[in-house]
Amino acid sequence: MARKTPIERYRNIGISAHIDAGKTTTTERILFYTGVNHKIGEVHDGAATMDWMEQEQERGITITSAATTAFWKGMGGNYPEHRFNIIDTPGHVDFTIEVERSMRVLDGACMVYCAVGGVQPQSETVWRQANKYGVPRLAFVNKMDRTGANFFKVYDQLKTRLKANPVPVVVPIGAEDGFQGVVDLLEMKAIIWDEASQGVKFEYKDIPAELQATAEEWREKMVESAAEASEALMEKYLGGEELTRAEIVKALRDRTIACEIQPMLCGTAFKNKGVQRMLDAVIDFLPSPVDIPPVKGVDENDDEKKLERKADDNEKFSALAFKIMTDPFVGQLIFFRVYSGKINSGDTVYNPVKQKKERLGRILQMHANQREEIKEVLAGDIAAAVGLKDATTGDTLCDPTAPIVLERMVFPEPVISQAVEPKTKADQEKMGIALNRLAAEDPSFRVRTDEESGQTIISGMGELHLEILVDRMKREFGVEANIGAPQVAYRETIRKKAEDVEGKFVKQSGGRGQYGHAVITLEPQEPGKGFEFVDAIKGGVIPREYIPAVEKGIVDTLPSGILAGFPVVDVKVTLTFGSYHDVDSNENAFRMAGSMAFKDAMRKASPVLLEPMMAVEVETPEDYTGTVMGDLSSRRGIVQGMDDMVGGGKIIKAEVPLSEMFGYSTSLRSATQGRATYTMEFKHYSEAPKNIAEAVMAAKGTK
């Protein structure tokens, strides 16, 4: 099957933003203008095409990144047909993991900002993730029709808060109720969209006289940014020559793809203005799969051996599975991005991470939650596969004759846990299946059984995250469950060095005995360094074959510390000495000796409890700043600063222990009459004060 669209005309893009910047509405308009959707879905009515899980429609929050394909020939029909694969990403901080994994497979992103709210806390998180993966981006300032809308203020915030380098390619005509359209700085014409056709038709007009000077000033800035792309252009520009439209577009494109600048546009998706011009900017400035460096990977048997794959149909097939979803009709769907080569349904793919071959069943292309079955996918495509049993998020799928492991995604450790139990005994088994399926879809969600109490414990990134998963269990799997009070994921570590601590396991019970003896030194590591084991045995005092057993004994003890049974982190163990018995020594005895030595060393090394600290940002009207700050302080929070918001109001930044944040949304709503909102994300672990540590230990029955 020949390609319908050359790969140079592919754009794999994400639409990402803060919660209420109007991202889903913007995506809806994109689908409408690209001719896929004939009736526009509004988030306000809970009918948006991209928000396809029932809960998203109820809450008006986008949770899962649905992937959709659309086609665009330019708003005036003046471009050859381009193919957009659009990934809608959630803007709520509990779902940051979703944003992160979509960033991994994107080639470019449209960052949507609210013209009133400007750059909000979540925007900074998303921006950092885009930096991490080197994703070229455009900025789209939405909601220009709202009271308090200010395009240039958002421009200033992009520079100061995100350290971005925005280059407006349009400026607004009017704002708030008076927002009519935009001045296109490339054409130096005003674009006015026709409201009767929902913005499908438009006309170019002369720039309003009162905007002429503003338009010329911003065009000059845009041309200067373009000239900085190369010395030849700079000479031409400084020599007073006009740069052509094609030269400006190519120069801005090169600089955008190099992540040096971000073209900036504006509009109001709700009133059908501006999104069309943004789609043209996606074609003009964002990269196709061949404009970015080839994807990198390593040999499956040798991490040092670097490999790469070009975005070309004739290369060997390679793809990354970036999302798993359970679909009510076809079962498990695995979304994957093809980086190189092509594959047909029915072909065999190899998963080097799991070292298994699997047959690719049906391949579906998604349009939000409608689907079309296709026979073949090519380099640059994003599709969903049915019938892969072993693949999980972050796995590579490739040609069995040319294995490659593409860069894995790193997922954060959960910070909050809750016990969950089914309301009826009959649901016990169903609950197990449901939880395992949800955990397969979402790598930041974990399920385990507490050995002591036998309870099922679920862990995730925040209260909302777990609430939504329990909700999904009820809707999708029909399992009603009760959940316990949230539990904080504390950790344990040590503050000083404990030298030469011994563990001796000796058992003499007629016949063959047991004998293991290990001496260790335990010392703290810097935060985040994890566990390290050093073998410093000299002269064979412990035979080689027993040393891994000592390490295993210690590793098996790490998940349950001595203070309150929490995992031990950031410690280094050096095995320095020991002894053995020719007959009685065995691996099990040395495992026990290692475990005993470690527990004893922990007691002697000033063990402490660590608690997760959260970065909390509260957006509040000015009248409530005192109340909010007082409340944060009473929760052991440390206020770190305060910023002004575009449309008035303040952003308060603080660091607060997670244990003090339960139920915060309710108390914040009541303290500010529902006018303040907050976001929170995990920052780091820090030592819990003595009274808190004692209370935790007492609750665990270890005090």
From Swiss-Prot:
**Which GO MF terms does the UniProt record name?**
GTP binding; GTPase activity; guanosine tetraphosphate binding; translation elongation factor activity
- What PANTHER family does this protein map onto? RIBOSOME-RELEASING FACTOR 2, MITOCHONDRIAL, TRANSLATION ELONGATION FACTOR G-RELATED
Q: What does it do?
A: Catalyzes the GTP-dependent ribosomal translocation step during translation elongation. During this step, the ribosome changes from the pre-translocational (PRE) to the post-translocational (POST) state as the newly formed A-site-bound peptidyl-tRNA and P-site-bound deacylated tRNA move to the P and E sites, respectively. Catalyzes the coordinated movement of the two tRNA molecules, the mRNA and conformational changes in the ribosome.
Compartments where located: Cytoplasm
tr-type G domain segment(s): 8-290
Major localisation: cytoplasm
| Record's keyword annotation contains Cell membrane | no
User: Its encoding gene is what?
Assistant: fusA
Q: List the Pfam families.
A: EFG_C, EFG_III, EFG_IV, GTP_EFTU, GTP_EFTU_D2
Q: Does the keyword Transferase apply?
A: no
Write down the species.
Ralstonia nicotianae (strain ATCC BAA-1114 / GMI1000)
Which Gene Ontology cellular component annotation is one that this UniProt entry carries?
cytoplasm
Q: Which GO terms describe its biological process?
A: ribosome disassembly
UniProt family annotation: Belongs to the TRAFAC class translation factor GTPase superfamily. Classic translation factor GTPase family. EF-G/EF-2 subfamily.
What is the name listed in the Swiss-Prot or TrEMBL entry for this protein? Elongation factor G 1
Residue sites binding GTP per the record: 17-24, 88-92, 142-145
Q: Which domain of life is it from?
A: Bacteria
| Keywords, alphabetical | Cytoplasm, Elongation factor, GTP-binding, Nucleotide-binding, Protein biosynthesis
